């Protein structure tokens, strides 16, 4: 039933293909136990980012927009979160406004918690706006797992937490 096609492709299979780059085991283990507030309005991006972070041993709290991020941070005890990964473009309140709101809070960790801008906008002006809003680091989308884990490590060092 149907037609069968046979084709011959003129190439050889490499017996020693290059290994795909991934997070080094010691790198992944080094963020174990880190408490991260992940702020993302896109369900697939949230799922992928959470999978990467939890796979490396981090404890992830979710917020789906800037307003929820501000609420989650303000209702938490100071020092609860080691890092905030903040999408820049979201409904209700964008990541820049959420960051400015968090930075203006009267609590000891509001000015010091590392906040990472996550965005597909990679122009220098976008990075500058993120820094002006109070974000410390910049992570391009689509997210690369190794880069994400390295960025969280940088956050932990910035926040005074030693990597495990």
Identify the residue ranges that each predicted region occupies.
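C-terminal compact regulatory domains
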Residues: 1-164
């Amino acid at each position: 039933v149907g037609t069968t096609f046979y084709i011959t492709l003129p190439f050889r299979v490499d017996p020693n293909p290059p290994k795909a780059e991934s997070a080094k085991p010691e790198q992944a283990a080094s963020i174990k136990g880190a408490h991260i507030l992940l702020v993302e309005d896109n369900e697939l991006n949230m799922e992928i980012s959470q999978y990467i972070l939890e796979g490396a041993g981090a404890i992830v709290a979710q917020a789906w927009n800037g307003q929820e991020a501000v609420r989650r941070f303000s209702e938490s005890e100071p020092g609860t979160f080691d890092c905030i990964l903040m999408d820049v473009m979201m409904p209700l309140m964008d990541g820049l406004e959420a960051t400015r709101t968090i930075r203006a809070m009267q609590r000891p960790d509001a000015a010091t918690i590392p906040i990472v801008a996550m965005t597909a906008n990679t122009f220098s002006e976008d990075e500058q706006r993120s820094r002006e809003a109070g974000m410390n680091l910049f992570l391009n989308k689509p997210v690369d797992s190794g880069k994400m884990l390295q960025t969280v490590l940088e956050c932990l060092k910035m926040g005074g937490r030693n990597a495990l």
